[in-house]
């Protein structure tokens, strides 16, 4: 993971791919260490019905040689670090539900001129 504005600032993080999560959740301390800027807040409903709010930023994410700039949430200590479906799609990856591994996905386009 890198700061898209200052690419020299980077950190390695292990994430669980979570197809039920819209955004990726990264520990706040890690995002702060690479100077990711907070750009607002997002509200989310958890599986147990609770509503939480987290700060949002944009980070450059690299997985298996694929790179994308993606929205990330500043995770708190109790949050699980995950790679959300938005980042997976931006990276052109999907979870193989049989093996649990990441694999390239076929991207859809309605039309092209």
Pin down the residues of each PLM region:
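Pepsin/retropepsin-fold aspartyl endopeptidases
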Residues: 1-113
């Amino acid at each position: 993971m890198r700061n898209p504005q200052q690419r020299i600032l980077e950190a390695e993080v292990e994430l669980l791919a979570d197809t039920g999560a819209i955004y990726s959740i990264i520990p706040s301390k890690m995002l702060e260490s690479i100077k990711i800027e907070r750009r607002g807040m997002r509200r989310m409903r958890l599986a147990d019905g609770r509503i939480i709010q987290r700060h949002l930023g944009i980070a450059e994410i690299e997985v298996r040689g694929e790179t994308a700039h993606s929205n990330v949430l500043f995770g708190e200590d109790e949050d699980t670090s995950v790679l959300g479906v938005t980042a997976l799609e931006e990276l052109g990856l999907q979870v193989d539900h049989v093996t649990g591994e990441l694999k390239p996905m076929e991207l859809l386009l309605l039309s092209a001129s």
